[in-house]
Amino acid sequence: MKMKLETLNSSGLPEPNDKDLVKSNCVSRFIKQQIDKAGARISFRDFMQHALYEEGLGYYSSKANIIGVNGDFITAPEYGEIYANSLAKQCAIITSEIKGATILEFGAGTGALAVGILKKLKEMRCLPEHYFIIEISKNLIDHQKRKLKQEVPELASIVSWISSVPEEFTGIVIANEVADAFSFERFVRTSNEVLQVCVAKDKEKFRYDLIPANNKLCDYVVFLEKIIGHKLDHGYLSEVSFEAQDWVKEVACKIKSGVFLILDYGIPRSEYYAPNRNQGWTRCHFMHHAHNEPLIYPGIQDITTWVDFSILSEIASDNGMKIDGFLNQSQFIINSGIEENFQNFDKLDLKAQIELSRQIKLLTLPDQMGENFKCLGLSKNFNLNTNLFKSRDRAYVL
């Protein structure tokens, strides 16, 4: 019997407004044209690339509201200054100990993290000469520039936007919720072969089409099975992001001296490809509703997958970086000196006390962001002399 992968419907999700629906229909037509050009199907990776990143059309290049209350999801920096302060303290170590060290942030979103880090570094008198941002969305770049000019006009001149990591980079690279956004392949394991998940069209809708995997994907699944010590079960569905792997390799190779922090929702390989995770880790976000079907509402919903931190740490290590530690977000914030946020707690008014408590709960509680989000710390030619990874480091699970 031929293996099939069914498409889920949109029941339970909010209805898009007329403007977003028109946009999604335009994206759908474009992707269908690409399917026609390819013959019968395109890889899931290509579908995702078109839906999210196609210039002038995809989700990240044309949707007005992505992050925040009026968008589809909220990231940790949007909740307040605690998260940014935690990262700023790590930045301060690098900028104070390495002459000419700079800060580079991948995918700066609304600019909230950059603003928060710069405010804290100014307070600590540890401002860098340069704060670089690599951002693929022109809409988000415009948003970031406005936010910086509004909230830290005296520091806006420090910030500049670049297209790639400079050669022989010295400083700290921060990637907050970046690794999960790279386009990825999906695969299905059967008893005798590996199938690649592709996307075809069926009248007006998209559908999945499974074909024998190419050598690269097939070899990777065989590699996985060798590492985890058993063959994946028949019908096992999962993902792999070769683009995220290539990205880590590029960054690692270009860092001459400094630190690379990858912060995202993810887990080690042993959990990622566990037997009970046979439906994979693909997640979509639409108007603050999370679901598992990427083929609906193309161009107006986010598509992500959880991060396999094991493979990213191995690639970084293979390219000259040291693994300093691996923490959940809760421990990252605690180890960064969470108590400082409560030094003047009694002097705050009731509203400010409630807001501070809310931030702490959202960022640290296991049922919020505290457990699922992780921090992988990497360094090269630099001793990260900090307490960040001294308590409850879980690098041994990678």
What function would you assign to each model-found segment?
Residues V222-L398:
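Long, Lys/Arg- and hydrophobic-enriched amphipathic alpha-helices
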Residues K2-F106, T110-T170, Q331, E340, ...:
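Rossmann-like AdoMet
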Residues V165-S191, L237-F242, D246, E250-L261:
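A short SAM/SAH-binding and catalytic strip from SAM-dependent methyltransferases
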Residues Y60, A181-F184, E271, N385-N387:
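Short helix/loop capping segments that flank catalytic or ligand/cofactor-binding pockets
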Residues F106, I136, V178-A181, Y265:
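Generic detector of well-ordered alpha-helical packing
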Residues Y83, V173, D264:
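Conserved RecA-like P-loop NTPase ATPase core
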Residues I174-V222, P275-H285:
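A mobile, often basic/glycine-rich helix-loop segment
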Residues A112-A114, D142, S183-F187, E271:
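Active-site-proximal flexible loops/turns
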